[in-house]
């Protein structure tokens, strides 16, 4: 493609100038009823959107690749591109074709990006949509996140890139901005929507000035963020990007908040994955904690609940207030009346963001009107119950005058777009009513004119019509066209008819079109003025939306507690977990049979449990339910248990299951050890640690040694609250050697060749692993099971010789193998006998009668 603009047609020169201003993103260039893409953009869009790639003549002597999408269907195409991590510049015609000399003036009016999109059709309804900027300086990592659909603006500083990776895993931003010289780009490998930004966008002074201008402040001290200088650099970049893409004021972004790790219970990426909080191990959303807990009736409530789940808090006062509200809503039977009212509130949070961006559509305003209408009844049902609930209701506020405004201004069911009018209600503006009356009167006038012209000409096929290209016309069939009077001026010839215009009709057309144009222009002006009338109370409405979101979450949690038989947990300042009759919140919902509830007791004197028992016995479920019950307590939810007392926690770690990380070239064992190393370095005495089957990916002795050493480190060094599941029965001797360690096991019963899993947790070590019984259940051939039993009997015989020496009812795998040579065990496929060999060697067709007789005697002798 030739870059010299003088060699291109005027229109293509205009396109190339606009494209040069937006080089890294797709440019949707408005031409009539289509958005067109040219050159490389056309090729890329054709491949991504599965649309036709064509050519549009030539410019500068070269053919122009072209693809296009209809403007009225653009949202569907934008949604697909955004989901693929692409950004799109929307270029509109802003000039008047009638007065333009050369190409109509065009400009980019907005840039749609995955992280800054606010259109309802382009957003995941029940999931946050974030743009994040990350930055690193002198070993300190920082992340700033902005939710364009709510104005929520958060910053965090982190000690290392691993913590940053965990934070990205929690937030899952739709778009990530990073400096050109960012030193840890490898942590971004699995993310879409990556944007390299120039280093100057992260300069501290620039960032502070930009933030102060946005908030209308002279200092950031009032937000408590002035010392988080690395995070402020990231915040400056993300705000600059938002302003660059939206190209309008952002009044809903009016504050910034510093999130402190000390305020929350930390969960690393492995823990979020293993506990299946909002996403299951297969990448879906079913059978997750959120799937069970989230029955919120508003999308904004659903998004808030997911944030709570991913970031449990440590503020006991705030947790108790949440519990009080849940308790009260249950006892006062307010769940049923509140939920339908909240449902009618809808997604007020995102509607307000579109109001702030002046991109709200007519139906957004009717939804806002409906939401505001619910507020008095919501307040009536929620106030005067508890101080905590009253504080929430007070935040909702009163917007009756705005509701009345929207009721006067917008018709009951408006069209989707303001583009063609018909949105502003009759009686709202007198001038608009006059223009509309003039337009509406055209119908009667045209009917009268048609009757009059038929009578005057005697042409019974004469009729008056209108189209957007030729305006009003008088149509006469070809068979009667010769009767047209001399003053009829031909306007258009069709196959079966002629169309004419007369001065009277032309005069009236000009008058009506002027009325329609004036009516539409005034209606658009009045619609824009509505934003000005709503804007002064935007901040208050945002606070109301936040309160309504929280009320929706708490009402939802009250309903879940009531429906699922959850109890209110208590908190202790001492470390420990004491759960009686605990249940796994997800598994109990998918089981057909009743869930077997189990207890757990951990404290400073009993802080590590060695968990043994058969495969499929429920060890992983048991450990996960303890973590999930603890996490649920720390979001303020009631929990699935008979009772629960949860002590102070700072982190939850899990090392459960592993698979090869092929993308990073790491084996299963390497993944396992990396996760274990993170736990051993980061865990404290206030951490809850779940370890399942450490050391399986290497040799028996290596694995056992590592498992033993890790358990001993956790028991003696960190003294974390730990559940350590293992099939290495040697570890069951740890309680006799270390303080604070105890054995528990998942019970099972064996009957003949079958096994029954009791799924109940008992004190003490398991007596055996039941591995052969589980293998038989899995369908392993009986011959293989029989061979395994022979091998097991031999190993158990050896084990008895070490029982006294090592005081282990299971024997000791570390020493048993050295005691004696393994005797020959009957092979799975028996060797052939001499008789069988002799019989196989005989070929009857080759034997003479004498040889056959000799062979028979030989076989008889072998049998004897």
Swiss-Prot record:
KW Hydrolase (keyword) present: no
Family matches, as InterPro entries: DNA_mismatch_repair_MutS (IPR005748), DNA_mismatch_repair_MutS-lik_N (IPR007695), DNA_mismatch_repair_MutS/MSH (IPR017261), DNA_mismatch_repair_MutS_C (IPR000432), DNA_mismatch_repair_MutS_clamp (IPR007861), DNA_mismatch_repair_MutS_core (IPR007696), DNA_mismatch_repair_MutS_N (IPR016151), DNA_mismatch_repair_MutS_sf (IPR036187)
Residues that, per the record, bind ATP: 613-620
Pfam families (alphabetical): MutS_I, MutS_II, MutS_III, MutS_IV, MutS_V
GO BP field: mismatch repair
A molecular function GO annotation: damaged DNA binding
Any Gene Ontology CC annotation: cytosol
Family named by the database record: Belongs to the DNA mismatch repair MutS family.
Function of the molecule: This protein is involved in the repair of mismatches in DNA. It is possible that it carries out the mismatch recognition step. This protein has a weak ATPase activity.
PANTHER family: DNA MISMATCH REPAIR PROTEIN MSH1, MITOCHONDRIAL (PTHR11361:SF34), DNA MISMATCH REPAIR PROTEIN MUTS FAMILY MEMBER (PTHR11361)
Name of the featured protein: DNA mismatch repair protein MutS
Gene (name only): mutS
């Amino acid at each position: 493609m030739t870059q010299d603009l003088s060699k291109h047609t005027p229109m293509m020169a205009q396109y190339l100038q606009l494209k040069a201003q937006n080089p890294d993103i797709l440019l949707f260039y408005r031409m009539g009823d289509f958005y067109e893409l040219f050159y490389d953009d056309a090729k890329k869009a054709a491949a991504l959107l599965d649309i036709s790639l064509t050519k549009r003549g030539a410019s500068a002597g070269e053919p122009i690749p072209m693809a296009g999408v209809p403007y009225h269907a653009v949202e569907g195409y934008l949604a697909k591109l955004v989901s693929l991590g692409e950004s799109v510049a929307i270029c509109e015609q802003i000039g008047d074709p009638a007065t333009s000399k050369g190409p109509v003036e065009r400009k980019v009016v907005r840039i749609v990006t995955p992280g800054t999109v606010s259109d309802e059709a382009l957003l995941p309804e029940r999931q946050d949509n974030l743009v994040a900027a990350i930055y690193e300086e002198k070993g300190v990592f920082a992340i700033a996140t902005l939710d364009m659909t709510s104005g929520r603006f958060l910053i965090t500083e982190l000690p290392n890139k691993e913590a940053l990776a965990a934070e990205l895993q929690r937030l899952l931003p739709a778009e990530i901005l990073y400096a050109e010289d960012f030193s840890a780009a490898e942590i971004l490998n699995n993310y879409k929507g990556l944007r390299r930004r120039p280093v100057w966008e992260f300069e501290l002074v620039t960032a502070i000035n930009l933030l102060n201008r946005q908030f209308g402040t002279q200092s950031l001290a009032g937000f408590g963020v002035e010392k988080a200088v690395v995070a402020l650099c990231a915040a400056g970049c993300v705000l600059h990007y938002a302003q660059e893409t939206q190209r309008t004021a952002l009044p809903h972004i009016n504050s910034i908040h510093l999130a402190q790790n000390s305020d929350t219970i930390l969960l690393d990426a492995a823990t979020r994955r293993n506990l299946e909080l909002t996403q299951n191990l297969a990448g879906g959303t079913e059978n997750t904690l959120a799937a069970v807990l989230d029955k919120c009736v508003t999308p904004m409530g659903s998004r808030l609940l997911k944030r709570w789940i991913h970031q449990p808090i440590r503020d006991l006062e705030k947790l108790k207030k949440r519990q009080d509200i849940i308790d009260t809503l249950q006892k006062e039977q307010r769940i049923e009346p509140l939920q339908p009212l909240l449902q009618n509130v809808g997604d007020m949070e995102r509607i307000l963001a579109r109001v702030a961006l002046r991109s709200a559509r007519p139906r957004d305003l009717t939804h806002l009107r409906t939401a505001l209408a619910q507020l008095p009844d919501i307040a009536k049902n929620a106030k005067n119950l508890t101080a905590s609930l009253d504080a929430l209701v007070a935040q909702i506020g009163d917007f009756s005058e705005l509701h009345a405004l929207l009721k006067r201004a917008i018709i009951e069911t408006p069209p989707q777009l303001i583009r063609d009018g018909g949105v502003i209600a009759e009686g709202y503006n007198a001038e608009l009513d006059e223009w509309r009356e003039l337009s509406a009167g055209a119908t009667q006038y045209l009917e009268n004119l048609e009757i009059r012209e038929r009578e005057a000409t005697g042409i019974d096929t004469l009729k008056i019509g209108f189209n957007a290209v030729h305006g009003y016309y008088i149509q006469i069939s070809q068979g009667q066209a010769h009767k047209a009077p001399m003053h009829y001026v031909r306007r258009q010839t069709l196959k079966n008819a002629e169309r004419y215009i007369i001065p009277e009709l032309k005069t009236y057309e000009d008058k009506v079109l002027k009325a329609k144009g004036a009516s539409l222009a005034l209606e658009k002006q009045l619609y824009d003025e509505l934003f000005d009338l709503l804007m002064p109370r935007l901040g208050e409405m945002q606070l109301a939306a936040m309160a309504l979101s929280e009320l929706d979450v708490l009402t939802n949690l009250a309903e879940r507690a009531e429906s699922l038989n959850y109890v209110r947990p208590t908190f202790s300042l001492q470390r420990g977990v004491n759960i009686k009759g605990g249940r796994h919140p997800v598994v109990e919902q998918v089981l057909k049979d009743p869930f077997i509830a189990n207890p757990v007791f951990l404290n400073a004197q009993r802080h590590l449990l060695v968990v043994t028992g058969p495969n499929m016995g429920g060890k992983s479920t048991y450990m996960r339910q303890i973590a999930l019950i603890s996490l649920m307590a720390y979001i303020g939810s009631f929990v699935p248990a008979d009772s629960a007392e949860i002590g102070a926690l700072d982190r939850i770690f899990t090392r459960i299951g592993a698979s090869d990380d092929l993308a990073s070239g790491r084996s299963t064992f390497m993944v396992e050890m990396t996760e274990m190393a993170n736990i051993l370095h980061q865990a404290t005495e206030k951490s809850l640690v779940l370890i399942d089957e450490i050391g399986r990916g290497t040799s028996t002795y290596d694995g056992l040694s590592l498992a033993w050493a890790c358990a001993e480190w956790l028991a003696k060094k960190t003294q974390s609250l730990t559940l350590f599941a293992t099939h290495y029965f040697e570890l069951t001797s740890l309680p006799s050697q270390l303080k604070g360690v105890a054995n528990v096991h998942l019970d099972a019963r064996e009957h003949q060749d079958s096994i029954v899993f009791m799924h109940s947790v008992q004190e003490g070590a398991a007596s055996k692993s039941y591995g052969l019984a589980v293998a038989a259940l899995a369908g392993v051939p009986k011959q293989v099971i029989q061979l395994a039993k022979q091998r097991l009997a031999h190993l158990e015989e050896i084990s008895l010789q070490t029982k006294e020496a090592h005081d282990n009812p299971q024997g000791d795998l570390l020493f048993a193998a050295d005691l004696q040579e393994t005797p020959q065990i009957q092979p799975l496929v028996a060797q052939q006998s001499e008789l069988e060999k002799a019989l196989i060697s005989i070929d009857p067709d080759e034997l003479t009668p004498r040889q056959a007789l000799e062979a028979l005697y030989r076989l008889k002798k072998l049998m004897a």
